[in-house]
Amino acid sequence: WVRDIYRSARAHDPTRLIEDNSACRYDHVETDLNTWHFYLHGYETLRRHVREVVEKTFPGSDFNFIGGNRQNGAPLLNSECGMVWGVDGSAGDSDLAWQYHYMLNEFRLQEKLCGFVFTELHDVVNEFNGYYRIDNTDKDFGYQAFCRGMTLRDLHAPDMVAMDCPPCRTVRAGETAETPLVLSHL
């Protein structure tokens, strides 16, 4: 049924991208966009998940597809991601701004990843994980404390310097620390 609908839509308008299933269950059949969803918190959990998806994405892979169907080289896109503040499985006291920063940093490290869709622009009742407060005022993400002048816009810029390291670590006096940097272009 999904394949028939995909092909019918393709026949009606061959100029548009068509997604067969918005893949929250890793259940693509035939699609122009290889997408997936996730709502995770914690640097290591998020990093492992994103890297697993990227590593398993290549033409011929059956990852993210069902029924014997395989990837055909369609662009990889995270079509739904967000934070878990105020919803079941809440991250509790985790910091929205820093989780968002390391989520986007991890996305920007992945050359195969063509983009993402963040699901909540504004806070809503019982979910406080948007870019803006429920009254539409700006949130202070605090990035200027990390790097003078940095704002949320810097994470969305076409070019960004991403860091391939945990969001924080302890370095003792006299120790040397290296941080691999990657120039990301979206």
Give the positions of each predicted feature.
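Active-site neighborhood of glycoside hydrolase catalytic domains
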Residues: 1-33, 73
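Conserved residues at the C-terminal ends of beta-strands
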Residues: 21, 37, 119
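Histidine- and/or cysteine-centered catalytic micro-motif in compact active-site loops
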Residues: 23, 39, 81
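Substrate-binding clefts and catalytic carboxylate motifs of secreted carbohydrate-active enzymes
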Residues: 28-31, 42-186
